[in-house]
UniProtKB/Swiss-Prot annotation:
Residue window of motif 'KMSKS' region: 253-257
Database matches in InterPro entries: aa-tRNA-synth_I_cd-bd (IPR045462), aa-tRNA-synth_I_codon-bd_sub2 (IPR020751), aa-tRNA-synth_I_CS (IPR001412), aa_tRNA-synth_I_cd-bd_sf (IPR008925), Glu-tRNA-ligase_bac/mito (IPR004527), Glu/Gln-tRNA-synth (IPR000924), Glu/Gln-tRNA-synth_Ib_cat-dom (IPR020058), GluQ/Sye (IPR049940)
Keyword line: Aminoacyl-tRNA synthetase, ATP-binding, Cytoplasm, Ligase, Nucleotide-binding, Protein biosynthesis
Family: Belongs to the class-I aminoacyl-tRNA synthetase family. Glutamate--tRNA ligase type 1 subfamily.
Top-rank taxon: Bacteria
Ligand binding (ATP): 256
PANTHER family, alphabetized: GLUTAMATE--TRNA LIGASE, GLUTAMATE--TRNA LIGASE, MITOCHONDRIAL-RELATED
Assembly behavior: Monomer.
Function, in words: Catalyzes the attachment of glutamate to tRNA(Glu) in a two-step reaction: glutamate is first activated by ATP to form Glu-AMP and then transferred to the acceptor end of tRNA(Glu).
One GO process term, biological-process aspect: glutamyl-tRNA aminoacylation
EC top class named in words: ligase
This protein's name: Glutamate--tRNA ligase
Provenance organism: Mycoplasma mycoides subsp. mycoides SC (strain CCUG 32753 / NCTC 10114 / PG1)
């Protein structure tokens, strides 16, 4: 059997961590077994559809390296039907009417006001699991004919079988059972002719010959309704699996309101995260590889994927770990790849790099290759090189705690002033000579030089920073601070 798995987003929002994890796990599952990964669009909720959401889904999936074998842009065999639900309304309506004719569904003429009144009556009796009253199930054929003649609006409700239990062997959770007594007759076709989610999704999965449905745990409650529909058509079920929640550091479901994490994939792109790092990290949310290795390429993840290794517990989205994994991938880039990538994230409105040579800029950026967690972070380090640093009182306190710092600075300044050949090796030698002449070392040597020469307590290799600042800037910094 060829495995066919799908990711089926609604265009009501943009690609985020949660639905990326769903897409990614389906992709890994399909590719591990040399199967097909399908993306279809579930756009029946027309009022909530967002402009640009479909494009966001595909652009960001492709950026992450998740390429569908079939989609609205890459249509498969015609036997699989359409890849967008709004193009299948006739198909859904035909099958809903078929169930009515087979006495497995019925027309419901109840108005929204009648349904609301029914709901209020049940809640007033403290009924927790409210259900449809089945009022229209018992209409006579004459009543139905009269309603149709009067052109009274109706939806189509599925008739839930009585006294039946459905059990699935969930890929993630094991056996899960559902009892029909907990479910009321539900709408499968709304009065506007649009199929409901549970009806459309079953037809789509059947038409596309989906073998495994892997999705978020919020869909568990939909599963019994979908199984009933499969049974009504005498269709075989796919294999179901429900991934556990992704939570934030407070234990709440990860959302755009989670303060500790970026939620949308587009945000990671804009901050300069690498797509392969995000792919790697999200693959570890609710799934664990064998062994201790956590830095895994897409091909490695496909090779070692095992659906038996899904977690039954919620997974916490750890922004610190996300940054760490991205920093590992940043370090693995070739220097030319790293430079091209990071340059595109420099804030050129704040830092005028046009006045600098390419060699100078490359030298500067490579100093931070082992430090950056994401590319946009480079802007946190550039004040140092564009004379935008200011010292505070804490820095003055640091100086006052050092041994004879004024002598150290004076010796260093005189030697820098006399230096003719401006190279890193010569600057390193001057620092050594200053140590000997001032009879200091360690913090008493480096801190005064760093603060006066660079106007900062912190930074990468001192000799490299001094070299990049240039002789004139270094002497100006020292003179301004001495005053």
């Amino acid at each position: 059997m060829s495995f066919r798995l799908r990711y089926a987003p609604s265009p009501t929002g943009f690609l985020h961590i949660g639905n990326t994890r769903t897409a990614l796990m389906n992709y890994l599952f399909a590719k591990h077994y040399n199967g097909s990964f399908i993306v279809r669009i579930e756009d029946t909720d027309l009022a909530r559809n967002v402009d640009g959401a479909i494009e966001s889904q595909f652009e960001n999936l492709n950026w992450l390296g998740i390429f569908p074998d079939e989609s609205i842009f890459n249509v498969g065999d015609q036997k699989y039907g359409k890849y967008m639900q709004s193009q299948k309304f006739d198909r859904y309506k035909q099958l809903a009417e078929q169930l009515v004719n087979q006495n497995k569904a019925y027309r419901c003429f109840c108005s929204s006001e009648e349904l609301e009144k029914d709901y209020e009556e049940q809640t007033s009796k403290e009924i927790i699991a409210t259900k449809y009253s089945q009022k229209c199930l018992f209409l006579t054929q004459d009543q139905i004919s009269q309603n149709l003649k009067d052109k009274k609006e109706y939806s189509i409700r599925f008739k839930v079988p009585q006294n039946k239990v459905w059990t699935i062997n969930d890929i993630v959770r094991g056996d899960v059972s559902f009892d029909s007594k907990d479910l009321g007759d539900f709408v499968i076709l709304k009065s506007n002719g649009v199929a409901t989610y549970n009806f459309a999704v079953v037809i789509d999965d059947y038409d596309m010959q989906i073998t495994h449905v892997l999705r978020g745990e919020e869909h568990i409650s939909n599963t019994p309704r979908q199984m009933m529909i499969y049974d009504a058509f005498n269709w075989n079920y796919p294999k179901f699996g429900h991934l556990t929640l992704i939570v934030d550091n407070t234990g709440k479901k990860l959302s755009k309101r989670s303060g500790n994490a970026l939620f949308f994939i587009e945000q990671y792109k804009k901050q300069g995260y690498l797509s392969q790092a995000i792919f790697n990290y999200i693959a570890l949310l609710g799934w664990s590889p064998p062994g201790e290795q956590e830095i895994l390429s897409q091909n490695e993840l496909i090779k070692i994927f095992d659906e038996k290794r899904f977690s039954k517990s919620p997974s916490t989205f750890d922004m610190v770990k996300m940054k760490w994994i991205n920093s590992v991938y940043m370090k693995k880039l070739e220097d030319n790849e790293y430079l091209e990538f990071v340059k595109s994230f420099i804030n050129t409105n704040k830092f005028d790099i046009t006045s600098k040579s390419e060699a100078w800029l490359n030298h500067l950026l490579l100093l931070y290759k082992k430090e950056l967690e994401y590319a946009e972070q480079i802007n946190d380090h550039l004040d140092l090189f564009f004379n935008k640093n200011t010292l505070d009182n804490n820095t003055i306190d640091v100086l006052n705690n050092l041994t004879n710092y004024k002598n150290v600075v004076e010796i260093f300044k005189n030697q820098i002033n006399d230096l003719k050949d401006w190279t890193i090796e010569n600057i390193k030698q001057i620092i050594k000579d200053t140590s000997t002449l001032a009879n200091v070392k360690g913090k008493d040597l480096f801190m005064p030089i760093r603060i006066f020469a660079t106007k900062s307590e912190h930074g990468p290799s001192l000799a490299d920073v001094i070299y990049l600042l240039g002789k004139t800037t270094v002497l100006n910094n020292i003179n301004s601070l001495e005053r």
